[in-house]
Regions:
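Glycine-rich phosphate-binding loop signature in dinucleotide/nucleotide-binding domains
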Residues: 44-46, 98-103
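Active-site-proximal alpha-helix that buttresses catalytic centers in soluble enzyme cores
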Residues: 3-83, 125
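Short, solvent-exposed coil/turn elements at secondary-structure transition points
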Residues: 10, 83-85, 136, 141
Length: 151
């Protein structure tokens, strides 16, 4: 049995009129949200073997705050360009590449893709909309990570 944690990035500052969405940094509120998410993950024993995150500043910063709070090494966190504003199909394709030795995987990314994937993976999560720094925890049976690309 594999476990997947889908975590939306924490709250970010608004983009400047001429700025890029991907350059938005976490707000003070977002930094507090990320710390609270880390505490909740720790309290539930949900420490990932591996975490993948999008290259957007807000997801990188969320990932770094989580990594530090969870006491995980740098190599346990990887940036993946395709995760930026990824659709459920792209998320599934990326997850399917994960080595079978990884039992608990975390994806730190964006809505609507994360919330839509959560709905696809677990009917109980229908109409779920992840809030900033919110997460869902899903058990993955069957063929493991590779099986997600076939669903």
């Amino acid at each position: 049995m594999r476990e997947l944690i889908l975590l939306r990035h924490a709250h970010a500052d608004a983009a400047p009129l001429e700025g890029n969405d991907s350059d938005r940094s976490l707000s003070a509120r977002g930094r507090a949200e990320a710390s609270l998410a880390a505490a909740r993950l720790l309290a539930r024993g949900l420490v990932p073997d591996l975490a993948l995150f999008s290259p957007a500043a807000r997801t990188r910063e969320t990932a770094e705050l989580l990594r530090t709070a969870l006491g995980l090494p740098l190599q346990a966190f990887r940036e993946l360009a395709p995760l930026y504003l990824a659709t459920p199909a792209v998320l599934r394709a990326q997850i399917a590449t994960i080595d079978a030795a990884t039992h608990r995987l975390m994806i730190i990314g964006h809505n609507p893709g994360l919330s839509e994937l959560a709905e696809e993976l677990d009917p109980k999560l229908r109409h779920t909309v992840l809030v900033n720094a919110g997460y869902v925890h899903v058990s993955i049976g069957g063929a493991g990570w590779r099986g997600l690309s076939e669903a």
